[in-house]
Amino acid sequence: VTGAPVEHLPFDQVDYWDEFKSILDWASTHVFSTMYLCWGAMGALNYRYGVRKVDLPEKIFGVFPQYLQDEYCFLTNGFDEIALQPHSRLAGVNEADVAANPDLQVLTWGPQSGPGLIATRDFSEVFALGHWEYGKTTLQEEYERDMAKGMSNVPFPHNYFPHDDPHLEPLFAWRSHANLLWRNWLNWVYQTTPYDLTEVPGLRAERRLGIDRF
């Protein structure tokens, strides 16, 4: 479930909020594991677990370090202790709400960008607050778009252009960790999804989707 540039709005003011919730309701009984990206992650965390969105005065924009919080998690298998992750958002999540929920675990975290990867304990839902799916020039294109709009709360992208020179080709410094995340997640989904999908609701209800079945 992808993001959208609507994180500055209250959830109930997003035109498709009701449709978004209905998709999540359907997925909870029909989908083995769902990955949410950026606003999709914020919306799902709020609707499913009551995690509040926190509006930011300035956009978190650029490539930021994320520190592993669980070096033995299969989702981050192969990650270095520090992984770079692109971020591009005007909001975050209330970290106290995440910490207070026993169903949630923070897998990566950064001092500037906060949680970058969160998952449920059974991994039926994975929440990426950053953008490991971004291509090499995506942040550059977003920066040029926002500058053309005259947005004053968008800083120059952090740790992206060599020597902070926008005339130089940006560095694709997150590609290896992005590939690891997708491969780890898809391999787990492939290995553990039951042939009979009618078993999914029961497995999710019993929280039996985790690595104990891998």
PLM regions and their residue ranges:
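Short C-terminal domain-edge/linker segments immediately following a structured domain
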Residues: S28-T34, P65-L68, D97-V98, G116-A119, ...
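Tryptophan-centric aromatic hotspots in well-structured domains and transmembrane helices
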Residues: W39, F64, H87-L90, E142-Y143, ...
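Soluble or luminal CAZymes and related metallo-dependent hydrolases
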Residues: D15-E19, G110, A173-L181
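Pocket-forming structural segment of enzyme catalytic cores
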Residues: Y47-T138, E206-G210
